Amino acid sequence: MMLGLFLLGRIFVLHKRYATVIGFDPGAQIEMVSILSWATPDTPIRESFYGYHPPLGFLIPRLLHLAGFSPEVSIQLVSFVASLLAFFFLRMTLRHIRLLHSPSGIAFLYITSSIPIQISVSTSVNLDVLILAMGSAVLCASVHLLWPSESFKDQKNQCPLPLRFGWSDPVIRERRWNAIIAGCATVTAIACALLTKFSGILLLGIPALAAWSQPFERGWWKRCSMGAVACICAVAIAFPYYYGRYYIREGRFIPLNTEWTAKDDIERSIVKRDEAPVRFLAQLFQPTAVHAAAGPTHTDYEVNRLSDAWRDLWIRNQWTGDTSPKALRVGLLYMHLFPWLIIAGGLFFLERIRRKAPWTRLGWIVVSFSILQVLALVQYIYRIPFAGYGPAKGLYILPTVWGIGYLAVSAFHDERLVPMRWRRHIPFIERALVGVVAVFVAINHAIPAY
Protein backbone atom coordinates (compact mmCIF):
# COMPACT_ATOMS: atom_id res chain seq x y z
CA MET A 1 0.00 0.00 0.00
CA MET A 2 2.73 2.46 0.98
CA LEU A 3 4.75 1.54 -2.11
CA GLY A 4 1.74 2.20 -4.34
CA LEU A 5 1.11 5.55 -2.67
CA PHE A 6 4.73 6.54 -3.18
CA LEU A 7 4.83 5.53 -6.84
CA LEU A 8 1.52 7.25 -7.60
CA GLY A 9 2.87 10.38 -5.94
CA ARG A 10 6.02 10.33 -8.06
CA ILE A 11 4.01 9.82 -11.26
CA PHE A 12 1.67 12.65 -10.26
CA VAL A 13 4.60 15.03 -9.77
CA LEU A 14 6.11 14.03 -13.14
CA HIS A 15 2.75 14.57 -14.87
CA LYS A 16 2.34 17.96 -13.20
CA ARG A 17 5.84 19.16 -14.07
CA TYR A 18 6.40 17.39 -17.38
CA ALA A 19 8.53 19.49 -19.77
CA THR A 20 8.86 22.24 -17.13
CA VAL A 21 12.45 23.40 -16.72
CA ILE A 22 13.41 23.75 -13.05
CA GLY A 23 16.95 23.99 -11.70
CA PHE A 24 19.83 26.25 -10.74
CA ASP A 25 21.72 26.20 -14.06
CA PRO A 26 19.34 24.39 -16.43
CA GLY A 27 20.59 26.14 -19.55
CA ALA A 28 24.17 25.01 -18.95
CA GLN A 29 23.17 21.37 -18.52
CA ILE A 30 20.83 21.44 -21.50
CA GLU A 31 23.67 22.90 -23.59
CA MET A 32 25.98 20.02 -22.67
CA VAL A 33 23.35 17.40 -23.55
CA SER A 34 22.94 19.10 -26.93
CA ILE A 35 26.62 19.33 -27.86
CA LEU A 36 28.16 16.18 -26.37
CA SER A 37 27.94 12.75 -27.93
CA TRP A 38 29.22 9.29 -27.11
CA ALA A 39 31.69 9.65 -29.99
CA THR A 40 33.00 13.00 -28.70
CA PRO A 41 32.27 13.01 -24.95
CA ASP A 42 34.42 16.04 -24.11
CA THR A 43 34.60 19.73 -24.88
CA PRO A 44 37.32 22.20 -23.87
CA ILE A 45 37.01 22.58 -20.10
CA ARG A 46 36.57 26.36 -20.13
CA GLU A 47 34.49 26.63 -23.29
CA SER A 48 31.12 26.02 -21.61
CA PHE A 49 29.86 26.83 -18.11
CA TYR A 50 29.35 23.11 -17.38
CA GLY A 51 32.24 21.98 -19.55
CA TYR A 52 34.36 21.18 -16.51
CA HIS A 53 32.05 18.36 -15.35
CA PRO A 54 32.78 14.72 -16.21
CA PRO A 55 30.58 13.66 -19.14
CA LEU A 56 28.45 10.71 -18.00
CA GLY A 57 25.70 12.86 -16.49
CA PHE A 58 25.18 14.44 -19.92
CA LEU A 59 25.66 11.33 -22.04
CA ILE A 60 22.89 9.36 -20.32
CA PRO A 61 20.11 11.84 -21.24
CA ARG A 62 21.81 12.18 -24.63
CA LEU A 63 20.54 8.67 -25.41
CA LEU A 64 16.94 9.82 -24.91
CA HIS A 65 17.64 12.96 -26.90
CA LEU A 66 18.80 10.80 -29.82
CA ALA A 67 15.54 8.85 -29.50
CA GLY A 68 13.57 12.02 -30.24
CA PHE A 69 12.98 13.68 -26.87
CA SER A 70 13.97 17.30 -26.34
CA PRO A 71 17.06 17.88 -24.16
CA GLU A 72 14.86 19.28 -21.37
CA VAL A 73 12.54 16.28 -21.30
CA SER A 74 15.46 13.86 -21.66
CA ILE A 75 17.10 15.27 -18.54
CA GLN A 76 13.79 15.28 -16.68
CA LEU A 77 13.09 11.63 -17.49
CA VAL A 78 16.60 10.63 -16.43
CA SER A 79 16.11 12.50 -13.14
CA PHE A 80 12.79 10.72 -12.62
CA VAL A 81 14.26 7.26 -13.24
CA ALA A 82 17.30 8.06 -11.09
CA SER A 83 15.08 9.09 -8.17
CA LEU A 84 13.21 5.79 -8.41
CA LEU A 85 16.47 3.84 -8.60
CA ALA A 86 17.69 5.63 -5.47
CA PHE A 87 14.50 4.53 -3.72
CA PHE A 88 14.61 0.91 -4.87
CA PHE A 89 18.32 0.45 -4.12
CA LEU A 90 17.70 1.73 -0.60
CA ARG A 91 14.74 -0.64 -0.37
CA MET A 92 16.96 -3.55 -1.44
CA THR A 93 19.45 -2.60 1.26
CA LEU A 94 16.76 -2.72 3.93
CA ARG A 95 15.47 -6.03 2.58
CA HIS A 96 18.95 -7.55 2.75
CA ILE A 97 19.36 -6.66 6.43
CA ARG A 98 15.77 -7.72 7.19
CA LEU A 99 14.50 -4.25 8.09
CA LEU A 100 12.24 -3.66 5.09
CA HIS A 101 9.09 -4.88 6.80
CA SER A 102 9.92 -3.51 10.24
CA PRO A 103 8.29 -0.24 11.38
CA SER A 104 11.69 1.44 11.55
CA GLY A 105 12.61 0.33 8.04
CA ILE A 106 9.28 1.45 6.57
CA ALA A 107 9.49 4.86 8.22
CA PHE A 108 13.14 5.36 7.26
CA LEU A 109 12.59 4.39 3.62
CA TYR A 110 9.55 6.55 2.96
CA ILE A 111 10.50 9.58 5.06
CA THR A 112 13.94 9.68 3.46
CA SER A 113 12.51 9.33 -0.04
CA SER A 114 9.76 11.94 0.48
CA ILE A 115 11.76 14.81 1.95
CA PRO A 116 10.83 17.82 -0.24
CA ILE A 117 14.18 18.18 -2.01
CA GLN A 118 13.97 14.51 -3.00
CA ILE A 119 10.69 15.17 -4.77
CA SER A 120 12.10 18.29 -6.41
CA VAL A 121 15.16 16.61 -7.91
CA SER A 122 13.01 13.80 -9.33
CA THR A 123 11.74 16.14 -12.08
CA SER A 124 14.29 18.97 -12.19
CA VAL A 125 17.40 19.62 -14.26
CA ASN A 126 20.30 18.51 -12.07
CA LEU A 127 23.18 16.06 -11.83
CA ASP A 128 22.91 15.43 -8.11
CA VAL A 129 20.01 12.99 -8.34
CA LEU A 130 22.31 10.75 -10.39
CA ILE A 131 24.88 10.89 -7.59
CA LEU A 132 22.16 10.01 -5.09
CA ALA A 133 21.06 7.02 -7.18
CA MET A 134 24.64 5.83 -7.58
CA GLY A 135 25.26 6.38 -3.87
CA SER A 136 22.21 4.28 -3.06
CA ALA A 137 23.53 1.60 -5.41
CA VAL A 138 26.94 1.69 -3.71
CA LEU A 139 25.27 1.37 -0.30
CA CYS A 140 23.20 -1.58 -1.48
CA ALA A 141 26.13 -3.35 -3.16
CA SER A 142 28.50 -2.69 -0.25
CA VAL A 143 26.08 -4.13 2.29
CA HIS A 144 25.49 -7.18 0.09
CA LEU A 145 29.25 -7.60 -0.31
CA LEU A 146 30.32 -7.07 3.30
CA TRP A 147 27.28 -8.08 5.37
CA PRO A 148 26.31 -11.71 4.56
CA SER A 149 22.57 -12.27 4.45
CA GLU A 150 22.86 -15.34 6.69
CA SER A 151 23.70 -12.92 9.48
CA PHE A 152 20.16 -11.67 9.84
CA LYS A 153 17.33 -13.43 11.56
CA ASP A 154 13.79 -13.05 10.35
CA GLN A 155 12.41 -9.82 11.79
CA LYS A 156 8.69 -10.63 11.57
CA ASN A 157 6.15 -9.69 14.21
CA GLN A 158 8.01 -6.66 15.44
CA CYS A 159 6.61 -3.73 17.34
CA PRO A 160 7.64 -0.19 16.45
CA LEU A 161 8.57 0.48 20.05
CA PRO A 162 10.94 -1.00 21.02
CA LEU A 163 12.89 -2.03 17.93
CA ARG A 164 15.54 -4.48 19.01
CA PHE A 165 17.20 -7.09 16.88
CA GLY A 166 19.57 -9.97 17.37
CA TRP A 167 21.68 -12.20 15.18
CA SER A 168 24.53 -14.64 15.21
CA ASP A 169 27.78 -14.14 13.36
CA PRO A 170 27.99 -16.78 10.63
CA VAL A 171 31.31 -18.41 10.01
CA ILE A 172 30.41 -19.21 6.41
CA ARG A 173 30.41 -16.46 3.81
CA GLU A 174 27.75 -16.07 1.14
CA ARG A 175 28.27 -17.95 -2.06
CA ARG A 176 31.32 -16.63 -3.85
CA TRP A 177 29.34 -15.79 -6.97
CA ASN A 178 27.08 -13.40 -5.03
CA ALA A 179 30.11 -11.71 -3.53
CA ILE A 180 31.66 -11.25 -6.98
CA ILE A 181 28.44 -9.70 -8.32
CA ALA A 182 28.19 -7.35 -5.33
CA GLY A 183 31.84 -6.37 -5.70
CA CYS A 184 31.47 -5.63 -9.41
CA ALA A 185 28.32 -3.61 -8.71
CA THR A 186 30.16 -1.56 -6.07
CA VAL A 187 33.03 -0.83 -8.44
CA THR A 188 30.70 0.05 -11.33
CA ALA A 189 28.51 2.40 -9.30
CA ILE A 190 31.47 4.29 -7.81
CA ALA A 191 33.22 4.55 -11.18
CA CYS A 192 30.03 5.89 -12.81
CA ALA A 193 29.66 8.45 -10.02
CA LEU A 194 33.27 9.58 -10.50
CA LEU A 195 32.53 10.09 -14.20
CA THR A 196 29.31 12.01 -13.48
CA LYS A 197 30.29 14.68 -10.97
CA PHE A 198 33.22 15.45 -8.68
CA SER A 199 31.04 14.85 -5.61
CA GLY A 200 30.99 11.20 -6.64
CA ILE A 201 34.41 10.96 -4.97
CA LEU A 202 32.62 10.96 -1.62
CA LEU A 203 30.94 7.66 -2.49
CA LEU A 204 34.31 6.01 -1.88
CA GLY A 205 33.49 6.45 1.79
CA ILE A 206 30.46 4.15 1.71
CA PRO A 207 32.32 0.81 1.34
CA ALA A 208 34.77 2.00 4.00
CA LEU A 209 31.91 2.83 6.36
CA ALA A 210 30.16 -0.47 5.59
CA ALA A 211 33.35 -2.38 6.42
CA TRP A 212 33.97 -0.32 9.55
CA SER A 213 30.42 -0.74 10.84
CA GLN A 214 30.11 -4.46 10.09
CA PRO A 215 28.86 -6.18 13.24
CA PHE A 216 30.84 -9.40 13.06
CA GLU A 217 33.52 -10.38 15.53
CA ARG A 218 35.52 -12.35 13.00
CA GLY A 219 36.64 -11.51 9.49
CA TRP A 220 36.91 -7.75 10.12
CA TRP A 221 40.18 -7.32 8.22
CA LYS A 222 38.96 -9.52 5.38
CA ARG A 223 35.86 -7.38 4.90
CA CYS A 224 37.86 -4.16 5.15
CA SER A 225 40.24 -5.50 2.50
CA MET A 226 37.33 -6.36 0.21
CA GLY A 227 35.93 -2.83 0.56
CA ALA A 228 39.36 -1.31 -0.06
CA VAL A 229 39.89 -3.40 -3.20
CA ALA A 230 36.51 -2.30 -4.56
CA CYS A 231 37.40 1.37 -4.02
CA ILE A 232 40.85 0.95 -5.59
CA CYS A 233 39.35 -0.70 -8.68
CA ALA A 234 36.81 2.11 -9.09
CA VAL A 235 39.52 4.77 -8.78
CA ALA A 236 41.69 2.86 -11.26
CA ILE A 237 38.86 3.02 -13.82
CA ALA A 238 38.32 6.77 -13.46
CA PHE A 239 41.92 7.87 -12.84
CA PRO A 240 43.09 7.91 -16.49
CA TYR A 241 40.23 10.24 -17.39
CA TYR A 242 40.90 12.59 -14.49
CA TYR A 243 44.62 12.62 -15.15
CA GLY A 244 44.36 13.15 -18.90
CA ARG A 245 41.56 15.69 -18.92
CA TYR A 246 42.04 17.64 -15.71
CA TYR A 247 45.53 17.26 -14.27
CA ILE A 248 47.42 17.61 -17.54
CA ARG A 249 45.30 20.51 -18.81
CA GLU A 250 44.52 22.39 -15.58
CA GLY A 251 47.23 21.25 -13.19
CA ARG A 252 44.74 19.83 -10.68
CA PHE A 253 42.38 16.89 -10.51
CA ILE A 254 39.30 18.90 -9.51
CA PRO A 255 39.06 22.27 -11.28
CA LEU A 256 35.97 24.41 -10.61
CA ASN A 257 34.41 26.75 -13.16
CA THR A 258 34.08 29.64 -10.70
CA GLU A 259 37.87 29.81 -10.54
CA TRP A 260 37.82 31.40 -14.00
CA THR A 261 34.23 32.63 -14.48
CA ALA A 262 34.30 34.65 -11.24
CA LYS A 263 38.06 34.89 -10.78
CA ASP A 264 38.25 38.43 -9.37
CA ASP A 265 35.38 37.88 -6.93
CA ILE A 266 36.88 34.61 -5.76
CA GLU A 267 40.29 36.18 -5.19
CA ARG A 268 38.80 39.03 -3.15
CA SER A 269 36.77 36.56 -1.10
CA ILE A 270 39.85 34.42 -0.45
CA VAL A 271 41.79 37.45 0.81
CA LYS A 272 38.91 38.33 3.13
CA ARG A 273 38.63 34.71 4.30
CA ASP A 274 42.34 34.47 5.06
CA GLU A 275 42.20 37.60 7.21
CA ALA A 276 40.01 35.77 9.74
CA PRO A 277 39.61 32.08 8.83
CA VAL A 278 38.15 31.11 12.22
CA ARG A 279 35.52 33.81 11.93
CA PHE A 280 34.75 32.68 8.38
CA LEU A 281 34.09 29.12 9.56
CA ALA A 282 32.08 30.30 12.57
CA GLN A 283 29.81 32.38 10.33
CA LEU A 284 28.96 29.26 8.33
CA PHE A 285 27.15 27.80 11.33
CA GLN A 286 25.35 30.99 12.35
CA PRO A 287 21.76 31.65 11.22
CA THR A 288 21.28 34.24 8.51
CA ALA A 289 19.23 37.40 8.98
CA VAL A 290 18.16 37.24 5.33
CA HIS A 291 15.53 34.58 6.05
CA ALA A 292 13.82 36.88 8.55
CA ALA A 293 14.24 40.07 6.51
CA ALA A 294 13.60 38.99 2.90
CA GLY A 295 11.89 35.65 3.50
CA PRO A 296 12.99 32.02 3.96
CA THR A 297 13.18 31.41 0.21
CA HIS A 298 15.97 33.97 -0.17
CA THR A 299 19.68 33.19 0.07
CA ASP A 300 22.34 35.19 1.89
CA TYR A 301 24.60 36.42 -0.91
CA GLU A 302 26.82 38.44 1.45
CA VAL A 303 27.93 35.75 3.91
CA ASN A 304 28.03 31.98 3.38
CA ARG A 305 25.58 30.21 5.71
CA LEU A 306 24.86 26.52 6.10
CA SER A 307 21.34 27.54 7.10
CA ASP A 308 20.75 28.20 3.39
CA ALA A 309 21.69 24.59 2.63
CA TRP A 310 19.32 23.40 5.36
CA ARG A 311 16.54 25.57 3.92
CA ASP A 312 17.08 24.05 0.48
CA LEU A 313 16.14 20.61 1.83
CA TRP A 314 12.63 21.81 2.70
CA ILE A 315 11.79 25.01 0.80
CA ARG A 316 12.44 26.05 -2.79
CA ASN A 317 15.22 28.56 -3.30
CA GLN A 318 13.80 31.69 -4.94
CA TRP A 319 16.46 31.30 -7.65
CA THR A 320 14.62 28.25 -9.04
CA GLY A 321 11.09 29.68 -8.98
CA ASP A 322 8.21 30.85 -6.82
CA THR A 323 6.84 28.96 -3.83
CA SER A 324 3.11 28.68 -3.16
CA PRO A 325 1.81 29.77 0.28
CA LYS A 326 0.79 26.19 1.12
CA ALA A 327 4.18 24.79 0.17
CA LEU A 328 5.91 27.53 2.14
CA ARG A 329 3.90 26.80 5.30
CA VAL A 330 4.56 23.06 5.06
CA GLY A 331 8.25 23.62 4.32
CA LEU A 332 8.62 25.98 7.29
CA LEU A 333 7.00 23.38 9.54
CA TYR A 334 9.52 20.75 8.44
CA MET A 335 12.41 23.20 8.58
CA HIS A 336 11.75 23.96 12.26
CA LEU A 337 10.49 20.52 13.37
CA PHE A 338 13.17 18.22 12.01
CA PRO A 339 16.12 19.75 13.94
CA TRP A 340 14.41 18.68 17.18
CA LEU A 341 13.75 15.20 15.82
CA ILE A 342 17.38 14.93 14.71
CA ILE A 343 18.65 15.99 18.13
CA ALA A 344 16.38 13.53 19.96
CA GLY A 345 17.17 10.73 17.51
CA GLY A 346 20.88 11.49 17.75
CA LEU A 347 20.80 11.10 21.54
CA PHE A 348 19.02 7.74 21.31
CA PHE A 349 21.42 6.64 18.58
CA LEU A 350 24.49 7.54 20.65
CA GLU A 351 23.07 5.66 23.63
CA ARG A 352 22.85 2.47 21.56
CA ILE A 353 25.84 3.06 19.31
CA ARG A 354 27.80 0.03 20.56
CA ARG A 355 25.05 -2.44 19.76
CA LYS A 356 25.47 -4.85 16.87
CA ALA A 357 21.85 -4.75 15.76
CA PRO A 358 21.34 -4.07 12.04
CA TRP A 359 19.38 -0.87 12.70
CA THR A 360 22.23 0.55 14.78
CA ARG A 361 24.94 -0.46 12.32
CA LEU A 362 22.96 0.96 9.42
CA GLY A 363 22.99 4.20 11.39
CA TRP A 364 26.76 4.04 11.57
CA ILE A 365 26.85 4.21 7.78
CA VAL A 366 24.13 6.75 6.96
CA VAL A 367 24.82 9.16 9.83
CA SER A 368 28.59 9.09 9.27
CA PHE A 369 28.16 9.56 5.53
CA SER A 370 25.79 12.49 6.11
CA ILE A 371 28.39 14.13 8.35
CA LEU A 372 31.00 13.51 5.64
CA GLN A 373 28.73 15.27 3.14
CA VAL A 374 28.43 18.34 5.38
CA LEU A 375 32.20 18.45 5.96
CA ALA A 376 32.76 18.24 2.21
CA LEU A 377 30.39 21.18 1.70
CA VAL A 378 32.30 23.19 4.31
CA GLN A 379 35.55 22.41 2.47
CA TYR A 380 33.97 23.42 -0.83
CA ILE A 381 32.75 26.73 0.61
CA TYR A 382 36.18 27.34 2.13
CA ARG A 383 37.78 26.81 -1.28
CA ILE A 384 35.15 28.94 -3.10
CA PRO A 385 34.26 31.53 -0.43
CA PHE A 386 32.42 33.95 -2.73
CA ALA A 387 28.89 34.04 -1.25
CA GLY A 388 27.49 35.72 -4.36
CA TYR A 389 27.99 32.44 -6.20
CA GLY A 390 25.76 30.64 -3.67
CA PRO A 391 28.00 27.67 -2.82
CA ALA A 392 25.94 26.69 0.26
CA LYS A 393 23.32 24.64 -1.59
CA GLY A 394 21.43 21.73 -0.10
CA LEU A 395 21.46 20.14 -3.54
CA TYR A 396 25.19 19.50 -3.18
CA ILE A 397 24.65 17.33 -0.09
CA LEU A 398 21.58 15.42 -1.22
CA PRO A 399 22.59 12.11 0.46
CA THR A 400 22.27 13.79 3.87
CA VAL A 401 18.57 12.93 3.61
CA TRP A 402 19.61 9.43 4.68
CA GLY A 403 20.95 10.69 7.99
CA ILE A 404 18.00 13.04 8.49
CA GLY A 405 15.47 10.27 7.92
CA TYR A 406 17.37 7.81 10.09
CA LEU A 407 17.67 10.15 13.08
CA ALA A 408 14.06 11.32 12.73
CA VAL A 409 12.91 7.70 12.99
CA SER A 410 15.31 7.04 15.87
CA ALA A 411 13.58 9.80 17.84
CA PHE A 412 10.62 7.40 18.24
CA HIS A 413 12.76 4.31 18.67
CA ASP A 414 12.86 3.84 22.43
CA GLU A 415 10.28 1.89 24.41
CA ARG A 416 10.79 4.27 27.33
CA LEU A 417 8.79 6.83 25.38
CA VAL A 418 5.69 4.71 25.99
CA PRO A 419 4.31 4.63 29.55
CA MET A 420 4.00 1.14 31.00
CA ARG A 421 0.21 1.25 31.11
CA TRP A 422 0.07 2.04 27.37
CA ARG A 423 2.40 -0.66 26.13
CA ARG A 424 -0.44 -3.07 25.52
CA HIS A 425 -1.53 -0.60 22.84
CA ILE A 426 1.72 -0.90 20.88
CA PRO A 427 -0.02 -2.54 17.87
CA PHE A 428 -2.25 0.51 17.62
CA ILE A 429 0.78 2.81 17.99
CA GLU A 430 2.43 0.90 15.16
CA ARG A 431 -0.50 1.53 12.82
CA ALA A 432 -0.67 5.18 13.87
CA LEU A 433 3.03 5.76 13.17
CA VAL A 434 2.79 4.13 9.76
CA GLY A 435 -0.25 6.32 9.10
CA VAL A 436 1.74 9.45 9.96
CA VAL A 437 4.44 8.38 7.49
CA ALA A 438 1.77 7.82 4.82
CA VAL A 439 0.41 11.33 5.43
CA PHE A 440 3.95 12.71 5.11
CA VAL A 441 4.39 10.94 1.77
CA ALA A 442 0.99 12.03 0.46
CA ILE A 443 1.29 15.69 1.47
CA ASN A 444 4.75 16.16 0.03
CA HIS A 445 3.77 14.67 -3.31
CA ALA A 446 0.35 16.32 -3.51
CA ILE A 447 1.40 19.91 -2.85
CA PRO A 448 4.41 19.24 -3.42
CA ALA A 449 6.04 21.03 -0.50
CA TYR A 450 8.85 22.51 -2.55
Each PLM stretch: what is its role?
Residues 117-130:
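Short acidic/glycine- and proline-prone juxtamembrane loop motifs at membrane-interface regions
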Residues 51, 55-59, 67-88, 121, ...:
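Loop-to-helix entry region of an early transmembrane alpha helix in multi-pass inner-membrane enzymes
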Residues 141, 147, 151-154, 162, ...:
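Perimembrane helix-loop-helix junctions
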Residues 9-15, 27-52, 56-59, 63:
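Extracytosolic helix-loop segments that constitute the early lumenal/periplasmic catalytic or substrate-binding loops
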